[in-house]
């Protein structure tokens, strides 16, 4: 399941593009998530009222949350699989407070892959997509293990 050094490099190369515009990428990813899986919107009291893509694009709260999500994910990706310290508080909040099912993390992973490919087709070809998929799968597997430790089977 681990990634090679080359695969991590592909992940981090495209992540540099994400970090250059966290707000834009985060907004696009969350909009893609909410449009593709409207049930995920119900987990966000702040966003439940956002019914259209125009509403979502106009929401400063959604933009801020996108920055929060991608900042946390970036910190995890930069650890190249050695992310236990970063994962623990994230798993704690997502399992006990927000009760976010692992399935929803799969949905946002799909949204991330889609948005990165649409925004950076040259830098996010098949090899980079494969590497990012592996990195996100590793993240989900490890957070699922933390969920289990916390007694959450979402």
UniProtKB/Swiss-Prot annotation:
Main location class: cytoplasm
GO MF annotation terms: heme binding; metal ion binding; nitrite reductase activity; oxygen binding; oxygen carrier activity; peroxidase activity
Residues bound to nitrite: 65
Catalytic reactions of this protein: Fe(III)-heme b-[protein] + nitric oxide + H2O = Fe(II)-heme b-[protein] + nitrite + 2 H(+); H2O2 + AH2 = A + 2 H2O
Binding site for heme b: 94
Domain Globin, residue spans: 2-148
GO biological process, one term: removal of superoxide radicals
Residue numbers of Phosphoserine PTMs: 4
Keyword RNA-binding carried by entry: no
Positions annotated to bind O2: 65
Subcellular localization(s) per the UniProt record: Cytoplasm, Sarcoplasm
PTM annotation (Phosphothreonine): residues: 68
GO cellular component, one term: extracellular exosome
Top-level class of the enzyme under EC nomenclature: oxidoreductase
Enzyme Commission designation: 1.7.-.-, 1.11.1.-
SUPFAM superfamilies assigned to the protein according to its UniProt record, in alphabetical order: Globin-like
Pfam family of the protein (one): Globin
Complexes and interactors: Monomeric.
Family in the record: Belongs to the globin family.
Physiological role: Monomeric heme protein which primary function is to store oxygen and facilitate its diffusion within muscle tissues. Reversibly binds oxygen through a pentacoordinated heme iron and enables its timely and efficient release as needed during periods of heightened demand. Depending on the oxidative conditions of tissues and cells, and in addition to its ability to bind oxygen, it also has a nitrite reductase activity whereby it regulates the production of bioactive nitric oxide.
UniProt name for this protein: Myoglobin
Gene: MB
